[in-house]
Regions:
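Catalytic-core regions built around general acid/base machinery
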Residues: 104-118
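Alpha-helix C-terminal capping/helix-to-coil transition sites in glycosyltransferase folds
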Residues: 83-84, 117, 154
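Short glycine-rich anion-binding loops that position phosphate/pyrophosphate groups of nucleotides
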Residues: 13, 47, 93-96, 127, ...
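Catalytic nucleophile loop
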Residues: 89-92, 114-134
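C-terminal and late-domain segments of enzyme folds
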Residues: 2-34, 49-56, 60, 137, ...
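Portal/gating segments that form or line small-molecule/metal binding sites
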Residues: 40-103
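Structural motif
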Residues: 8-9, 87-91, 122, 159
Length: 242
Protein backbone atom coordinates (compact mmCIF):
# COMPACT_ATOMS: atom_id res chain seq x y z
CA UNK A 1 0.00 0.00 0.00
CA UNK A 2 1.12 3.62 -0.50
CA UNK A 3 3.55 4.61 2.23
CA UNK A 4 1.71 7.83 3.18
CA UNK A 5 -1.69 6.37 4.08
CA UNK A 6 -2.97 7.51 7.49
CA UNK A 7 -6.21 5.88 8.57
CA UNK A 8 -8.25 5.54 11.75
CA UNK A 9 -11.01 2.98 11.19
CA UNK A 10 -13.48 2.46 14.01
CA UNK A 11 -15.96 -0.35 14.49
CA UNK A 12 -18.69 1.90 15.89
CA UNK A 13 -19.66 5.44 16.84
CA UNK A 14 -20.93 4.97 20.36
CA UNK A 15 -20.13 2.74 23.32
CA UNK A 16 -22.76 1.85 25.90
CA UNK A 17 -23.10 4.60 28.48
CA UNK A 18 -21.08 7.14 26.47
CA UNK A 19 -21.88 9.97 24.11
CA UNK A 20 -21.52 9.99 20.34
CA UNK A 21 -17.88 9.21 19.44
CA UNK A 22 -16.87 9.93 23.03
CA UNK A 23 -14.88 6.70 23.26
CA UNK A 24 -12.71 7.83 20.34
CA UNK A 25 -12.05 11.40 21.46
CA UNK A 26 -8.50 10.79 22.65
CA UNK A 27 -7.81 8.66 19.58
CA UNK A 28 -8.88 11.56 17.36
CA UNK A 29 -6.50 13.91 19.17
CA UNK A 30 -3.61 11.48 18.99
CA UNK A 31 -4.26 10.72 15.32
CA UNK A 32 -4.92 14.24 14.01
CA UNK A 33 -2.50 16.05 16.31
CA UNK A 34 -2.05 19.80 16.02
CA UNK A 35 -1.41 19.95 12.28
CA UNK A 36 -5.13 19.53 11.54
CA UNK A 37 -7.61 22.19 12.64
CA UNK A 38 -10.72 21.16 10.67
CA UNK A 39 -12.10 17.96 9.20
CA UNK A 40 -14.46 17.47 6.25
CA UNK A 41 -17.39 15.24 7.20
CA UNK A 42 -19.20 12.97 4.74
CA UNK A 43 -22.73 12.20 6.04
CA UNK A 44 -24.06 10.22 3.09
CA UNK A 45 -24.47 6.95 4.99
CA UNK A 46 -27.17 8.50 7.17
CA UNK A 47 -30.64 7.36 6.13
CA UNK A 48 -33.13 8.23 8.86
CA UNK A 49 -31.36 11.44 9.79
CA UNK A 50 -30.87 14.59 7.73
CA UNK A 51 -27.42 15.51 6.53
CA UNK A 52 -27.62 18.67 8.64
CA UNK A 53 -28.53 16.80 11.82
CA UNK A 54 -25.88 14.16 11.20
CA UNK A 55 -23.25 16.84 10.65
CA UNK A 56 -24.33 18.60 13.84
CA UNK A 57 -23.76 15.42 15.87
CA UNK A 58 -20.36 14.85 14.28
CA UNK A 59 -19.43 18.51 14.72
CA UNK A 60 -20.16 18.38 18.45
CA UNK A 61 -18.01 15.27 18.80
CA UNK A 62 -15.05 16.71 16.91
CA UNK A 63 -15.30 20.09 18.62
CA UNK A 64 -15.10 18.26 21.95
CA UNK A 65 -11.80 16.83 20.71
CA UNK A 66 -10.60 20.28 19.63
CA UNK A 67 -11.35 20.29 15.89
CA UNK A 68 -13.71 22.20 13.65
CA UNK A 69 -15.93 20.36 11.18
CA UNK A 70 -17.30 21.24 7.76
CA UNK A 71 -19.85 19.05 5.98
CA UNK A 72 -19.35 18.10 2.35
CA UNK A 73 -23.05 18.56 1.52
CA UNK A 74 -22.74 22.24 2.45
CA UNK A 75 -19.97 22.83 -0.08
CA UNK A 76 -20.74 24.39 -3.47
CA UNK A 77 -18.33 21.90 -5.03
CA UNK A 78 -17.98 18.61 -3.14
CA UNK A 79 -14.97 17.50 -5.15
CA UNK A 80 -13.12 20.73 -4.50
CA UNK A 81 -13.97 20.44 -0.80
CA UNK A 82 -12.26 17.05 -0.75
CA UNK A 83 -9.28 18.41 -2.65
CA UNK A 84 -8.82 21.20 -0.09
CA UNK A 85 -9.64 19.27 3.11
CA UNK A 86 -7.11 18.89 5.90
CA UNK A 87 -8.66 15.57 6.94
CA UNK A 88 -11.77 13.56 6.10
CA UNK A 89 -14.24 11.83 8.41
CA UNK A 90 -16.79 9.41 6.95
CA UNK A 91 -19.73 8.54 9.16
CA UNK A 92 -21.58 5.28 9.63
CA UNK A 93 -25.01 4.26 8.44
CA UNK A 94 -25.85 2.32 5.31
CA UNK A 95 -22.72 1.35 3.38
CA UNK A 96 -24.50 0.76 0.07
CA UNK A 97 -26.08 4.20 0.08
CA UNK A 98 -22.80 5.79 1.16
CA UNK A 99 -20.83 4.19 -1.67
CA UNK A 100 -23.53 4.99 -4.23
CA UNK A 101 -23.60 8.66 -3.29
CA UNK A 102 -19.82 8.98 -3.15
CA UNK A 103 -19.60 7.40 -6.60
CA UNK A 104 -22.32 9.64 -8.04
CA UNK A 105 -20.46 12.72 -6.83
CA UNK A 106 -17.13 11.52 -8.18
CA UNK A 107 -15.54 11.53 -4.74
CA UNK A 108 -13.94 8.08 -4.68
CA UNK A 109 -10.86 8.81 -6.84
CA UNK A 110 -10.40 12.22 -5.22
CA UNK A 111 -10.50 10.85 -1.68
CA UNK A 112 -8.21 7.99 -2.67
CA UNK A 113 -5.67 10.38 -4.18
CA UNK A 114 -5.72 12.68 -1.14
CA UNK A 115 -5.29 9.83 1.34
CA UNK A 116 -2.48 8.30 -0.68
CA UNK A 117 -0.80 11.72 -0.54
CA UNK A 118 -1.00 11.74 3.27
CA UNK A 119 -4.34 13.30 4.21
CA UNK A 120 -5.74 11.68 7.40
CA UNK A 121 -8.89 9.58 6.95
CA UNK A 122 -11.24 8.70 9.80
CA UNK A 123 -14.15 6.33 9.27
CA UNK A 124 -16.53 4.52 11.55
CA UNK A 125 -18.79 1.57 10.70
CA UNK A 126 -19.82 2.24 7.07
CA UNK A 127 -17.00 4.77 6.87
CA UNK A 128 -14.58 1.97 7.75
CA UNK A 129 -16.22 -0.37 5.24
CA UNK A 130 -15.63 1.98 2.31
CA UNK A 131 -11.91 2.18 3.15
CA UNK A 132 -11.66 -1.53 2.27
CA UNK A 133 -11.16 -3.02 -1.20
CA UNK A 134 -14.93 -3.68 -1.40
CA UNK A 135 -18.02 -3.25 0.77
CA UNK A 136 -18.77 -6.98 0.63
CA UNK A 137 -18.31 -7.49 4.39
CA UNK A 138 -20.75 -4.81 5.53
CA UNK A 139 -23.65 -5.79 7.78
CA UNK A 140 -26.10 -3.56 5.91
CA UNK A 141 -29.05 -4.28 3.66
CA UNK A 142 -28.59 -3.22 0.01
CA UNK A 143 -31.19 -0.45 0.07
CA UNK A 144 -29.34 1.42 -2.69
CA UNK A 145 -27.39 0.07 -5.65
CA UNK A 146 -23.89 1.46 -6.14
CA UNK A 147 -22.32 1.02 -9.58
CA UNK A 148 -19.89 -1.51 -8.09
CA UNK A 149 -19.04 -3.09 -4.75
CA UNK A 150 -15.48 -1.80 -5.19
CA UNK A 151 -14.63 0.86 -2.62
CA UNK A 152 -11.63 3.07 -1.83
CA UNK A 153 -9.13 0.23 -1.40
CA UNK A 154 -7.06 2.12 1.18
CA UNK A 155 -6.17 -1.11 2.99
CA UNK A 156 -5.54 -4.59 1.52
CA UNK A 157 -8.07 -6.44 3.69
CA UNK A 158 -11.74 -6.34 4.61
CA UNK A 159 -13.29 -5.11 7.85
CA UNK A 160 -16.51 -6.33 9.43
CA UNK A 161 -17.54 -3.63 11.93
CA UNK A 162 -19.73 -4.24 14.99
CA UNK A 163 -18.42 -7.80 14.95
CA UNK A 164 -20.14 -10.25 17.25
CA UNK A 165 -20.69 -13.96 17.08
CA UNK A 166 -23.73 -13.89 19.34
CA UNK A 167 -26.27 -16.61 18.57
CA UNK A 168 -29.48 -16.40 20.61
CA UNK A 169 -30.75 -19.76 21.87
CA UNK A 170 -33.17 -21.32 19.42
CA UNK A 171 -32.27 -18.94 16.58
CA UNK A 172 -31.77 -20.90 13.37
CA UNK A 173 -30.25 -18.17 11.21
CA UNK A 174 -26.59 -17.81 10.36
CA UNK A 175 -24.16 -16.16 12.75
CA UNK A 176 -21.94 -13.28 11.71
CA UNK A 177 -19.05 -15.74 11.52
CA UNK A 178 -21.09 -17.90 9.14
CA UNK A 179 -21.66 -14.95 6.83
CA UNK A 180 -18.01 -13.92 6.85
CA UNK A 181 -16.98 -17.52 6.21
CA UNK A 182 -19.17 -17.47 3.10
CA UNK A 183 -17.30 -14.42 1.84
CA UNK A 184 -13.94 -16.06 2.55
CA UNK A 185 -14.96 -19.24 0.77
CA UNK A 186 -15.70 -17.27 -2.39
CA UNK A 187 -12.77 -14.86 -1.88
CA UNK A 188 -10.06 -17.02 -0.26
CA UNK A 189 -7.25 -14.55 -0.94
CA UNK A 190 -8.91 -11.68 0.94
CA UNK A 191 -8.68 -11.76 4.77
CA UNK A 192 -11.41 -10.23 6.93
CA UNK A 193 -10.92 -8.60 10.33
CA UNK A 194 -14.00 -8.71 12.54
CA UNK A 195 -13.77 -5.67 14.84
CA UNK A 196 -15.89 -5.78 18.02
CA UNK A 197 -17.54 -2.56 19.13
CA UNK A 198 -15.21 -0.23 20.98
CA UNK A 199 -12.19 -1.17 18.86
CA UNK A 200 -10.38 0.31 15.87
CA UNK A 201 -7.38 -0.05 13.63
CA UNK A 202 -4.86 2.70 12.95
CA UNK A 203 -2.73 2.69 9.82
CA UNK A 204 0.43 4.76 9.48
CA UNK A 205 1.97 4.06 6.10
CA UNK A 206 2.51 0.31 5.98
CA UNK A 207 2.19 -0.15 9.76
CA UNK A 208 -1.04 -1.19 11.46
CA UNK A 209 -2.00 -1.25 15.13
CA UNK A 210 -5.17 -2.61 16.71
CA UNK A 211 -6.67 -0.78 19.68
CA UNK A 212 -9.47 -1.81 22.01
CA UNK A 213 -10.63 -4.00 24.85
CA UNK A 214 -11.36 -7.24 23.00
CA UNK A 215 -9.65 -9.42 20.41
CA UNK A 216 -10.33 -9.01 16.72
CA UNK A 217 -11.30 -12.15 14.84
CA UNK A 218 -9.51 -12.80 11.56
CA UNK A 219 -10.97 -14.98 8.81
CA UNK A 220 -8.92 -16.32 5.89
CA UNK A 221 -10.16 -18.73 3.25
CA UNK A 222 -11.34 -22.00 4.77
CA UNK A 223 -8.96 -21.77 7.75
CA UNK A 224 -10.32 -21.64 11.29
CA UNK A 225 -10.78 -18.04 12.49
CA UNK A 226 -8.02 -16.63 14.70
CA UNK A 227 -8.50 -14.19 17.58
CA UNK A 228 -5.88 -11.43 17.80
CA UNK A 229 -5.39 -9.31 20.90
CA UNK A 230 -4.91 -5.52 20.75
CA UNK A 231 -1.42 -4.44 19.72
CA UNK A 232 0.49 -5.04 16.50
CA UNK A 233 -0.73 -8.60 15.94
CA UNK A 234 -2.78 -7.59 12.89
CA UNK A 235 0.27 -6.27 11.05
CA UNK A 236 0.28 -9.37 8.86
CA UNK A 237 -2.90 -8.07 7.21
CA UNK A 238 -0.81 -5.26 5.73
CA UNK A 239 1.89 -7.72 4.67
CA UNK A 240 -0.14 -9.91 2.36
CA UNK A 241 -2.33 -11.59 4.97
CA UNK A 242 0.11 -14.31 6.01
Amino acid sequence: MPALNRLLLLSNSRNAGQGYLEHARDAFRDFLGTEVSRVLFIPYAGIRISHDDYAASARAAFEAAGYGLDAVHDAEDAGRAVDEAEAIAVGGGNTFHLLKTMAEQGLLPRIRARVEAGMPYIGWSAGANVACPTICTTNDMPISEPPSFEALGLIPFQINPHYTDAHPPGHQGETRSDRIAEFCTVNPAVPVAGLPEGTWVRVEGDRLSYVGHAPARVFRGTEAPVDVEPGDGLQFLMDGGR
